[in-house]
Regions:
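Hydrophobic alpha-helical segments, chiefly the membrane-spanning helices
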Residues: 1-358
Length: 358
């Protein structure tokens, strides 16, 4: 349907869908925080699970749409390509959120965040392993790699929840200079207090949440369909378009959510939202295989494996930043963010080279 539309009309549809994702994503993140506080969901359920689902609704919609239409390579590119770019969102938060105060990782330093980053690396490593397995290795519409990714994610959430509550170095350790003064997640309580002051009932909040989810899902489908047609019009590789332009567009909710958290002084939550979303994205391979009835990861191409390695590298840079907590800044960003930006910019040249050789 979209292939027959003019390039101008396709660009308008894509831009409108991107705007819808940005606006709806803002409402979704705010209502999610309010609802998780009112229903007492806790950090694990209300944070890393529910918010990961909410901020990744565009990716979920694109994965479902691509799986139903048989474009499994688009589903793979959407999942793996988005992780590297969503990590670059931390650069945006460092520059426009924290600014000249100090680096983001200096403010957000937490060993729990290091564990979250390790979980991202773990699920991405399994994704690389799964891409090398034969596509005939599937039973009851489930592949070993996609199931292992889901189990790693679930166990990782449990361990992170345990680390936040029971490990003495986290729960009772001394406060370090420059740490955020309030506990992680305090911005959620503030959002709930503001909603109560404005007399926003739970019913109204739920309705806004559902409306935002519906708009985001519909916009995600439009982004995938119009983006694929745009790539065809301009002669650009669909995988390259998906891992750059489309991935940047679907990362808009994370930008909005992160800037809001940093504005309220919740630096750790801002980083956790990115790591939590990145760890959740590979879980969508299980959803894609169930919908399509095929092994999805073996459809990963050179570009997808390249981007997965890039995601691991960028995450590793930030893990070093969490541990060493650099205060020095370059162009309003921490040294780690500067390195991430440089590595990502150079990696785009590699993407072009890979696309040109195929």
């Amino acid at each position: 349907m979209f292939e027959h539309l003019s390039l101008l009309l396709l660009l308008l549809i894509f831009a409108a869908a991107a705007g819808a994702v940005w606006i709806a994503g803002t409402y979704l993140s705010n209502t999610t925080d309010v609802l998780s506080t009112r229903f007492g969901m806790g950090e694990a359920l209300g944070g890393m699970i529910l918010l990961a689902l909410v901020t990744n609704l565009p990716e979920i919609a694109i994965t479902v749409s691509a799986s139903l239409s048989g474009h499994l390579e688009v589903a793979v590119g959407n999942i793996l390509g988005g992780i590297a770019l969503q990590t670059v969102v931390l650069v945006v938060l460092d520059v426009f959120g924290v600014g000249k105060q100090s680096s983001l990782t200096y403010r957000a330093a937490s060993l729990v965040l290091v564990l979250e980053g390790v979980m991202v690396i773990a699920v991405l490593t399994v994704a690389v392993i799964g891409s090398q397995l034969p596509d005939t290795l599937i039973f009851a519409r489930v592949t070993p790699a996609s199931l292992l990714i889901f189990l790693l994610w679930a166990v990782g959430l449990w361990l992170i929840g345990k680390a936040q509550k029971n490990l003495p170095w986290q729960a009772h350790g001394p406060t370090l200079p420059g740490d955020q003064p309030e506990e992680r997640g305090h911005s959620k309580k503030k959002k709930d207090d503001n909603a109560r002051q404005q007399q926003h009932s739970t019913t109204r909040t739920v309705l806004v949440f559902l409306a935002g989810a519906a708009v985001t899902l519909a916009a995600g489908v439009l982004l995938e369909r119009s983006g694929e047609a745009i790539a065809g019009h301009i002669g650009m590789s669909g995988v390259l378009f998906g891992s750059t332009v489309l991935a940047a567009t679907t990362s808009l909710p994370e930008v909005s959510t992160g800037l809001t958290s940093i504005k309220m002084g919740d630096y750790q939550l801002a980083v956790s939202d990115i790591f939590g979303g990145n760890a959740f994205l590979p879980v969508l391979f299980l959803l894609a295989s169930i919908i399509s009835g095929k092994a999805v990861l073996p459809h990963a191409g050179k570009t997808d494996i390249y981007l997965t390695g890039l995601g691991i590298l960028l995450t590793s840079i930030y893990l070093f930043g969490m541990i060493f907590r650099p205060r020095q800044q370059i162009a309003r960003m921490g040294i780690d963010s500067f390195l991430v930006l440089v590595v990502y910019a150079l990696s785009v040249l590699g993407l072009v080279a890979i696309s040109g050789s195929q």
